């Protein structure tokens, strides 16, 4: 009788660990953050607290399943080489704006993206970074194409 109880307890403990691990993965926990500075053409400095997505698995998930992204925060996608980046909004319920940034930190494009839209939003040239923020944040902060992200 004691042996069956121990086996049952071990089974339920293992099941609980599995369920917790599975549910934590879907929640898409926050990544490490860094305060980024954007120098505008007018001479202002604009700051954004950005999560850093620098691995394939973190870049793939991005802001998926996140219902609210506060103003002044974002996610910087870091790639190893320059390429024409394409993003979509699969499983992303929050409207976002994206800036495509070259290897020197110069913002080349800014686009708005609609929640759950599966259309590609492509950079117009080769870039190395993409910065996603709540939709309209770049405009509200006075950030424009040609401004420069101070790279780390």
Language-model features, listed with the residues they occupy:
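C-terminal motif of bacterial Sec signal peptides marking the signal peptidase cleavage site
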Residues: 19-23
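Bacterial N-terminal signal peptides that target proteins for export
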Residues: 2-12
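Compact, glycine-rich, soluble single-domain proteins
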Residues: 25-152
């Amino acid at each position: 009788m004691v042996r069956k109880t121990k086996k049952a307890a071990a089974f339920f403990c293992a099941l609980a660990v599995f369920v917790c691990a599975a549910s934590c993965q879907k929640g898409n926990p926050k990544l490490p953050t860094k305060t980024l500075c954007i120098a505008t053409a007018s001479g202002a400095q604009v700051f954004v607290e950005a999560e850093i997505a620098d691995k394939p698995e973190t870049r793939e998930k991005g802001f998926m399943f996140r219902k609210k992204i506060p103003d002044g925060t974002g996610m910087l996608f870091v790639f190893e080489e320059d390429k024409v980046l394409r993003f979509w909004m699969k499983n992303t319920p929050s409207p976002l704006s994206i800036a495509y940034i070259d290897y020197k930190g110069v913002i080349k494009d800014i686009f708005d993206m609609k929640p759950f839209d599966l259309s590609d939003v492509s950079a117009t040239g080769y870039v190395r970074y993409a910065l996603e923020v709540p939709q309209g944040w770049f405009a509200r902060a006075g950030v424009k194409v040609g401004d420069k992200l101070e790279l780390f």
